[in-house]
Curated annotation (Swiss-Prot):
Belongs to the class-I aminoacyl-tRNA synthetase family. MetG type 2B subfamily. It catalyses: tRNA(Met) + L-methionine + ATP = L-methionyl-tRNA(Met) + AMP + diphosphate. Homodimer. One of its GO terms (molecular function) is methionine-tRNA ligase activity. This is Methionine--tRNA ligase. Its EC number is 6.1.1.10. One of its GO terms (biological process) is methionyl-tRNA aminoacylation. Is required not only for elongation of protein synthesis but also for the initiation of all mRNA translation through initiator tRNA(fMet) aminoacylation. The gene is metG. Residues 562-665 form the tRNA-binding domain. It is found in: Cytoplasm. It comes from Streptococcus pyogenes serotype M18 (strain MGAS8232). ATP binds at K311.
């Protein structure tokens, strides 16, 4: 009997609408779950949401709703997306689920009792967006005042940090560092792809593994520590334990935990959260005396030609749009075919439409159309009985399919989806070539060889049956459509697949429907670009061309790169007051959507004698100016943009519906 198989996605942080990069991991895990089921494994597939933390509390406050209502709304949206993408998960866990919170609290107290957690004090640079502390040396950028003192900075993720000093409980990671290194040496294939484990050891363990702050007192949206309820459990103990609690760990009914945690345990995460899963999670399991997972895969990201997805760049792609326009299977196929193992992949509208036309419509769709049409034409719709070596080309086709099936299974086990699909398309290409080699239209003539013609039709149908089986984990609808046109039931097993196993006396459909109609390349590329917001890239019937004249400007011309370095954000005015001792300056407290209010001083007092009229307005600010001390103790952390017209000045505002922190560009 095959071992039970447990596959997990990371639990996603519900801070905004998910794009195709966010959907990749869930589809990738779904493909593996479906493959393992077809191979005879009992599978448990887990996904869900990480719903606690300061960022959630802040966003809920901005929206004027409770944190629970905020995460309830996000969970509804995410579940709807997974339904659209036909994700076959068994459980959708939310860290606000009662059973999970109860186990988190109990585990915290257990680790406290065994001295793997202790009370201390933490002072350091904290990123609300990352929910992570950083040392000064880890910061990507450091802000200093005029005296050279560090007053802020930017985390490696690009998010701002703030200085936090508070009482905190700590997890004794340092106590387990040697044991973790020994585990890595015993299990060199634990982290995939190759090289990722070495990154973790070199960057985080060899420099000295520091104990981890695992509680906070500056916000309340989390699991309270039972013995010290002014503390809430910090994200990583809370979030990581979901992989165990979802199966019943620490609960009365723990049958699934006993079964699946003692089977094959397989985690898949994005490379940005590998550290937490490769260091914190194994150590937490050691503390709890639980078995280690079998495999941890850290995949790359989908990026655009001009870098990471950004609304301001007009390059964000949402899965809903692609599914509505092109269907589900092309999206699943494209994402799994286009991201190489261990590296990033690039999404382009041209590549997306091109793969549909050339690989799905031309290669696969035409093969099915031609095969069904010829079986109807030459054998009244009945697939001839399969025989070996009916033509001089049968043996080569059969041998190639056997070899590619072996490669397919090898790559599927390694979660190398691009190569697994490459093996499938090698079968498709060889089968298309087989039609040209055997020339069935010649064999069908009066003086042709009807026995060879029958063998050709049988081999074509048998090859398509093989293809329908191996694409099923990726493209369920397409697999079922191929099987239906061949007169067969949907795929239910992959463990014993052979070319010669085509059922006898099978009738194909009388007239096949194209499974992938060809697309108008230019029109569909333009459609995707329009949905992304990149209207400048859309083909125009008549393009306006400006005259070559010297442009007028009051300042020196700058390059686009220089301008692109300026980050302009939407910021809501929370408070505004006059600065004592200054007739020009107003002091603003604004929310720029980065989890903490910032102070900006602006010399616009004479234009706004009733400065309180600005409270609640959404302004445009330069968010990445180096902070500077302007008067007395006040430091300005940005610049408010305004327009001069004659002797008047007006601050630039945006519509109240635009979220705080939105990037303008």
């Amino acid at each position: 009997m095959k071992k039970p198989f447990y596959i997990t996605t990371p639990i996603y942080y519900p801070s905004g609408k998910l794009h195709i990069g966010s959907a990749y991991t869930t589809i990738a895990c779904d493909v593996l779950a479906r493959y393992k089921r077809l191979m005879g494994h009992e599978v448990f597939y887990l996904t869900g949401l990480d719903e606690h933390g300061q960022k959630i509390q802040t966003k809920a406050k901005e929206a004027g709703i409770s944190p629970q209502t905020y995460v309830d709304n996000m969970a509804k949206d995410v579940k709807a997306l997974w339904q659209l993408l036909d994700i076959s998960y068994d459980t959708f866990i939310r860290t606000t689920d009662d059973y999970h919170e109860e186990v988190v609290a109990a585990v915290f107290e257990k680790l406290l009792a065994q001295d793997d957690i202790y009370l201390g004090e933490y002072s350091g640079w904290y990123s609300v967006s990352d929910e992570e502390f950083f040392t000064e040396s880890q910061l990507k950028e450091v802000f200093r005042d005029e005296d050279g003192q560090v007053i802020g900075g930017i985390a490696p993720s690009g998010h701002e940090v703030e200085w936090v000093s508070e009482e905190s409980y700590f997890l004794r990671l340092s106590k387990y560092a040697d044991r973790l290194v020994a585990f890595f040496k015993e299990r060199p294939d634990f982290i995939q792809p190759d090289g990722r484990m070495n990154e973790m050891v070199k960057n985080f363990i060899e420099p000295g593994l520091e104990d981890l702050a695992v509680s906070r007192t500056t916000f309340t949206w989390g699991v309270p520590v039972p013995s010290d309820p002014k503390h809430v459990v910090y994200v990583w103990i809370d979030a990581l334990l979901n992989y165990a609690t979802a199966l019943g760990y620490g609960q009365a009914n723990h049958a699934n935990f006993d079964k699946f945690w003692n089977g094959t345990v397989f985690h898949m995460v994005g490379k940005d959260i590998l550290r937490f899963h490769s260091i914190y999670w194994p150590i937490l399991l050691m503390m709890l005396d639980l078995p280690m997972p079998d495999r941890l895969i850290a995949h790359g990201w989908f990026v655009m030609k001009d870098g990471k997805m950004s609304k301001s760049k007009g390059n964000v792609v949402y899965p809903e749009m692609l599914v509505e326009r092109f269907g589900l299977d092309p999206l699943r196929y494209y994402l799994m075919r286009s991201l190489p193992v261990g590296s990033d992949g690039t999404f382009t509208p041209e590549d997306y439409v091109g793969r549909i036309n050339y690989e799905l419509a031309n290669d696969l769709g035409n093969l099915l159309n031609r095969t069904v049409a010829m079986i109807n034409k030459y054998f009244d719709g009945t697939v001839p009985a399969y025989v070996d070596n009916g033509t001089a080309f049968d043996a080569d086709l059969s041998q190639l399919i056997d070899a590619q099936l072996a490669d397919y299974h090898k790559h599927m086990e390694a979660v190398d989806y691009p190569r697994a699909l490459e093996a499938v398309w090698t079968i498709i290409a060889r089968t298309n070539k087989y039609i040209d080699e055997t020339a069935p239209w010649v064999l069908a003539k009066e003086d042709g060889d009807k026995a060879q013609l029958a063998s050709v039709m049988a081999h074509l149908a048998a090859s398509l049956r093989v293809v329908a089986h191996v694409i099923q984990p990726f493209m369920m609808e397409t697999s079922a459509a191929i099987m239906a046109q061949l007169g067969l039931a949907p795929v239910s097993d992959l463990s014993t697949l052979a070319l010669a196993d085509f059922p006898a006396n099978t009738k194909v459909v009388a007239k096949g429907t194209p499974i992938f109609p060809r697309l108008d390349m230019e029109a569909e590329i333009d459609y995707i670009k329009a949905q992304m917001g990149d209207s400048s890239a859309i083909s125009q019937e008549k393009e306006w061309v400006p005259e070559e004249v010297a442009l007028k400007s009051e300042k020196d011309v700058i390059t686009f790169e220089t301008f692109d370095a300026v980050e302009i954000r939407v910021a809501e005015v929370k408070e505004v007051s006059k600065v004592e001792g200054s007739e020009k300056l107003l002091r603003f407290r604004v929310d720029a959507g980065d989890g903490q209010d910032r102070q900006i001083l602006s010399g616009i007092a004479k234009f706004y004698p009733n400065e309180q009229e600005l409270v609640g307005k959404k302004l445009q600010i330069v968010a990445n100016l180096k902070p500077r001390k302007m008067v007395k103790k006040y430091i300005s952390q940005g610049m408010i943009l305004s327009a001069e017209h004659g002797d008047q000045l007006t601050v630039l505002t945006v519509d109240s519906s635009v979220p705080n922190g939105s990037i303008i560009g």
